């Protein structure tokens, strides 16, 4: 079970515990829009992979975008080091992977993680998330081998947090 930190960790922990599977992280960071940091225009991971929404970045200052991408890559690497505490990443080549997040509003971070995991020659990628809009579910189903989502609303409320009673930020310590 691979969690996208930080929000995906509590969800992934419960899945790993219930299925008696190993738990690790896959450190991916959202690149937020300069005027609304919660809206993803791209994603980066700790392995220096990146994915951007080409339509969204057309009107973004390229210098700002380059700096933001680099900043988020460094943060992804920092988090990977913190969460692993010197331990090696799980060996996932030729393994089935359950990729978990707390939800997917745009799907960019999960799509990047899927692309990166495919490069690592995983056997099967199953995305497990509590909620995602219908249009994103379609994209994730095409990108991954399987999608398990508890809710796929036709009319998404705009943010993953709207589907939680308590959507407090998960700290690095937690």
Label every PLM stretch briefly.
Residues 1-174:
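PRPP-associated nucleotide enzymes
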